[in-house]
């Protein structure tokens, strides 16, 4: 409810001077969204593809480069430009070689490089701050003195200051570099010379990923106009005195240690398939062996399994299917490491 007897926080004179824009440092009116964000960003992409081959060998190569710039309205105030800047490089190379009329070897290699530069603060936090920061309590900055950026601010109570969204955005920088290499070698073998409808394939997959990260930051100095240091009768006069609001600012940039992380994934799979029709009888069978190792810490995660399927139908009307899986993981105790999982179904 409104208290009609309460003293207004802002006088009619204050509101008139703010609306007139007579002195944006004494009576600021900040559109924080316009200060922090642009109306548009750029995305650029280039792609080159090459494919060809003959009866024995087929190949495909692709190089894709993309660049995304962010909406942040930043300049190079420090040794960085911390507008969001993302570069992606992707290389794909596929080769298929027909070793014999019944044997095909394939190798697929994918390499990805990603570099991201940004403030060390999320866009979500910046949007939240522009919605919650008052536009009339302090200006974005005051005119620079001695090369120092003089961020505006004010005291909420005691020694607690407001958050200046522009300072929050400008005074930190982070860079992340990621590299991924994924290689798959696959062999397909037709075994019709043993019995018609029998095929086997195997593949080995090795994936490695690495990442490095570091950030830089500088502690900002916050100022406000000292009370009584300006002429109330000449508001267009820019002669005033600033007072420092915090003692923890710095003129020096600090940088974190470079953090590194990586992981490797190894997969091996053998697959034996059989499918054949005898008049109205359709018979199918599959036997699959798979193992996987994922390593990111000292101890790897390992999975191993054998699975199979047997199918039969008569005239595609009477159906039978049997499946089983015998799977294990090192994350369980030795006596519970493997389990058998059968399934049977009938249909008509």
Name these PLM-found stretches.
Residues 77-82, 122-132, 216-226, 300-307, ...:
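Flexible, surface-exposed loop regions and adjacent strand-edge segments
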Residues 20-31, 66-77, 157-169, 244-254, ...:
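Flexible, solvent-exposed coil segments and beta strand-coil junctions
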Residues 98-100, 257-267, 275-348:
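Structural signature of Gram-negative outer-membrane beta-barrels, strongest in the C-terminal barrel
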Residues 1-33, 133-168, 214-263:
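Flexible glycine-rich, low-complexity coil/linker segments exposed to the extracellular/periplasmic environment
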Residues 24-64, 68-72, 82-162, 174-178, ...:
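Flexible loop and strand-edge segments within Gram-negative outer membrane beta-barrel domains
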């Amino acid at each position: 409810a409104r208290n009609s007897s309460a003293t207004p926080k802002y006088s009619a004179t204050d509101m008139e001077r703010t609306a007139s824009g007579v002195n944006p440092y004494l009576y600021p009116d900040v559109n924080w969204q316009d200060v922090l964000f642009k109306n548009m960003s750029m995305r650029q992409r280039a792609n080159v593809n090459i494919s060809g081959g003959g009866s024995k060998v087929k190949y495909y190569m692709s190089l894709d480069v993309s660049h995304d710039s962010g909406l942040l309205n930043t300049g190079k105030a420090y040794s960085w430009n911390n507008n969001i800047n993302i570069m992606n490089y992707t290389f794909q190379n596929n080769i298929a070689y027909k070793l014999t009329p019944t044997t095909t070897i394939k190798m697929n290699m994918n390499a990805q490089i990603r570099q991201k530069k940004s403030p060390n603060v999320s866009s979500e936090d910046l949007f939240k701050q522009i919605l919650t920061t008052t536009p009339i309590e302090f200006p974005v900055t005051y005119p620079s003195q001695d090369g120092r950026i003089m961020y505006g601010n004010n005291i909420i109570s005691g020694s607690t200051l407001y958050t200046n969204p522009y300072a929050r955005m400008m005074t930190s920088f982070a860079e992340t570099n990621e590299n991924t290499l994924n290689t798959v070698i696959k062999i397909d073998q037709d075994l019709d010379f043993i019995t018609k409808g029998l095929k086997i394939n195997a593949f080995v997959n090795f994936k490695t990923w690495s990442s490095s990260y570091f950030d830089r930051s500088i502690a900002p100095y916050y100022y406000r106009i000292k009370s009584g240091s300006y002429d109330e009768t000449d508001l267009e006069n820019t002669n005033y005195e600033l007072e420092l609001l915090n003692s923890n600012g710095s003129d020096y940039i600090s940088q974190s240690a470079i953090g590194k992380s990586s992981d490797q994934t190894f997969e091996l799979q053998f697959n034996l398939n059989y499918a054949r029709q005898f008049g109205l009888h359709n018979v199918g069978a599959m036997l699959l062996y798979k193992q996987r190792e994922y390593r990111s810490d000292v101890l790897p995660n390992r999975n191993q399994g054998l699975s199979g399927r047997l199918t039969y139908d008569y005239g595609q009307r009477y159906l039978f299917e049997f499946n089983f899986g015998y799977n294990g993981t090192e994350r369980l105790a030795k006596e519970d490491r493997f389990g058998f999982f059968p399934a049977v179904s009938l249909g008509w």
